[in-house]
Amino acid sequence: MRALDNGEVCIFVGGTGNPFFTTDSCAALRALETSCDVILMAKNGVDGVYTADPKTDKSAKLIKTITYHEILDKKLKVMDATAAGLLEDSNIQIRVFEMKPENFLKVITGDSMGTLITK
């Protein structure tokens, strides 16, 4: 936690080591513990949240902004419900984007690529 206290950017990866806790729940817990403003969620092969699975539905459309409530209501498979509930209650946003090396720098410098999930 010294790095956070010094204003450094910290990247958390992995799980909690507890059964029944997904990596989504782990990310939500770490975000709460460290008073994060936003979670950066890099996805493999998809560049944000879509109205349907873009790999199987050609009519799927990228959603630029969506709420946690809408994700749960529409049963979009972005994250597990426990993590979504924790983050919604805490007003922590998520930026979902495609996991490419060049995208990390773009996102942390303010690029609005992908999807923003808000309260």
Predicted regions and their residues:
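C-terminal catalytic "cap/lid" subdomain
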Residues: 1-119
